């Protein structure tokens, strides 16, 4: 796909989903105003066709599109720094990885330790959900200098870095109920509490999912058009 096509696709991303979300917001505002004024609640569904020419809704739509574009640009910038996936790094790359990003979660592991594999599974799940935090891992056997420097005695050991400084750590599963069957949500909440992850609301997850799905559909559609034209 050529750059102009990509730019055009991005400019029209998620119109249907965003407009529907804007309509929901608009309806909530109407209901809130009705309630505040002591009027009868409005139960009718919002007609999107009637709202299309509403200047307030158009502004709301434009603001939402602009916010989503900024979010996409921010995500892309994070991904260029290695965010959005759970990656293995070498000892030689370690310092660069933890100093180039504001928040970094690094799992020091041993490939034969069962509990390290459990931690791997959870961190791999969290990495794409929290793009503003970098998730990496390093084989403790191949990183003797940093294992000693960071005084790592027990594995798994998850070191939490903020602006290149080791601020906290998770040693084994002692902060996770000392059980192997803890949930990803439990780990996520712990990392939120420690300031390493941003708390995500359910609405944000749903809108983000819809938006990303619309991106994929738009790209697939453009790709099919290109294929047909060939």
UniProtKB/Swiss-Prot annotation:
GO terms for molecular function: beta-tubulin binding. It comes from the Eukaryota. Keywords: Cytoplasm, Microtubule, Nucleus. The keyword Nucleus applies. Expressed in roots, cotyledons, leaves, stems and flowers. Belongs to the phosducin family. This is Thioredoxin domain-containing protein PLP3B. The gene is PLP3B.
């Amino acid at each position: 796909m050529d750059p102009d096509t990509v730019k055009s696709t991005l400019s029209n991303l998620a119109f249907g989903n965003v407009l529907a979300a804007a309509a929901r917001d608009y309806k909530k505002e109407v209901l809130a105003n009705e309630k505040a004024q002591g009027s009868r609640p409005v139960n009718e569904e919002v007609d999107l066709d009637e709202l299309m020419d509403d200047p307030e809704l158009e502004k709301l739509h434009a603001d939402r599109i602009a916010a989503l574009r900024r979010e996409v640009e921010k995500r892309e910038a994070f991904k260029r720094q290695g965010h959005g996936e759970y990656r293995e790094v070498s000892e030689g790359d370690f310092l660069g990885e933890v100093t180039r990003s504001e928040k970094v979660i690094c799992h020091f592991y041993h490939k034969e330790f069962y509990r390290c594999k459990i931690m791997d599974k959870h961190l791999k799940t969290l990495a794409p959900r929290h793009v503003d935090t970098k998730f990496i891992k390093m084989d403790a056997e191949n990183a003797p200098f940093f294992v000693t420097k960071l005084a790592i005695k027990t594995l798994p050991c998850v070191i939490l870095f903020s602006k290149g400084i080791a601020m906290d750590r998770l040693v084994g599963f002692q902060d996770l109920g000392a059980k192997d069957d803890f949930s990803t949500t439990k780990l996520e909440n712990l990392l939120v509490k420690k300031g390493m992850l941003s708390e995500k609301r359910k609405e944000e997850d749903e809108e983000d999912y819809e938006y990303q799905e619309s991106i994929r559909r738009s790209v697939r559609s453009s790709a099919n058009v290109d294929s047909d034209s060939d």
